[in-house]
Amino acid sequence: MDLGIKGKTALVCASSKGLGLGCAEALAEAGVNLVMNARGAEALEAAAERIRQDQGVEVTTIAADIATEAGQKAVLNGVGQIDILVNNAGGPPPGMWHDWDREDFIKALDANMLAPIAMIKALVPAMMDRGWGRVVNITSQSVRAPIGVLGLSNSARTGLTGYVAGTSRQVAGKGVTINNLLPGIHATDRADALDGNVVKQRNISLEDARAERAATIPAGRYGTRHEFGAACAFLCSQHAGFIVGQNLLLDGGATNLTM
């Protein structure tokens, strides 16, 4: 399917690896030029060069911590016209409710709520002026079904979801859509960290931890970044203009919900 976005430019945050990279790869395959962002310059440039070689699109890299105001300014100062924004940032660490203090919550809110809001506020007005734009926020399945050990993530990402619910409906009339992708477990570094936490808590092997988690997923496996990226690219496409303020679960059926 031709997504109808060839020649547009996307800013994909936290895209040197994992789900962000999956989104960048899928958009590049659709002919979209990229501005890729991540904290580590070396890994970021390596990922960008692979995409340049594979897809022949223009790829600019900006190494900065998007969770900070300084990082956001660095990224925004380094971009031109942005048609597509993919908000992404690493999730806060797992733990128990009594482990977290105020600073832990502030860090989680900065990375997973306030940073994407800042990027939306900075880039969406110009999209509205042009009459077209796409914003996709990578959140978590925990927005729909909170996960006990991910209380920091539950809190911050749910806050972003509430913001998007209202904002998306205010900008849709100008041709701009804002939607959220809610990943369940995917084969990423984040999954490794979560499984590693299970290993420590229960004194089992990493293989057993992964097998137990996979057994709770109707699909029987972890998702891939390529599957996730394909969903992201569709939400950014010309075909998704009537999808507004939605939360799309990509979890292999793990979250048993009908609405």
Report the location of each language-model feature.
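Substrate-binding pocket helix/loop in short-chain dehydrogenase/reductase
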Residues: 72, 96-98, 104-109, 135, ...
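Alpha-helical segment proximal to the catalytic Tyr-Lys
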Residues: 125, 169-170, 241
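Short C-terminal tail/terminal secondary-structure segment
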Residues: 3, 145, 233, 244-259
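Conserved glycine-rich Rossmann-like NAD(P)H-binding loop of the short-chain dehydrogenase/reductase
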Residues: 32-47
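Short, small/polar-rich loop/turn modules that mediate ligand/substrate recognition or access, typified
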Residues: 172, 177, 243-245
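Catalytic loop of short-chain dehydrogenase/reductase
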Residues: 136-159, 164-173, 185-186
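Conserved glycine-rich cofactor-binding loop
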Residues: 9, 14-18
